[in-house]
Regions:
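Walker B catalytic acidic pair
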Residues: 72
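Active-site-proximal or metal-binding-adjacent scaffold patches in catalytic folds
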Residues: 1-67, 76-97
């Protein structure tokens, strides 16, 4: 994981606003959105709609944060990583460019 200078750290509320914005675009509504330190993952999505993001994401570039956010939000529609999931992920991220 890369470290950004302290002045580049995104505030937690800004990050959560990014999650809400992407959720509206994708058409999903997470039950809960949390940030906490995680040792081995960038994020996780529970079967009950709880999204948990690694606090280290706050130090990452916006494009990478978007990839992780979209990935987890899409799990609210598609619970696996098969072809339909990957196609949706590519389509959503292509909207960003």
């Amino acid at each position: 994981m890369t470290q950004a200078p302290l002045e580049e750290v995104v505030p937690a509320e800004v990050f959560k606003a990014e999650v809400r914005s992407w959720a509206r675009r994708i058409g999903v509504e997470p039950e809960e959105v949390h940030l906490r330190p995680m040792k081995r993952k960038w994020a996780s999505c529970s079967s009950n709609g709880r999204l948990t993001f690694n606090t280290e994401l706050l130090r990452e570039p916006a494009a990478f944060r978007a990839e992780v956010i979209v990935h987890e939000l899409l799990h609210l529609k598609v619970p696996n990583h098969r072809k339909p999931f990957r196609a949706l992920l590519r389509a959503c991220l292509a909207q960003e460019t």
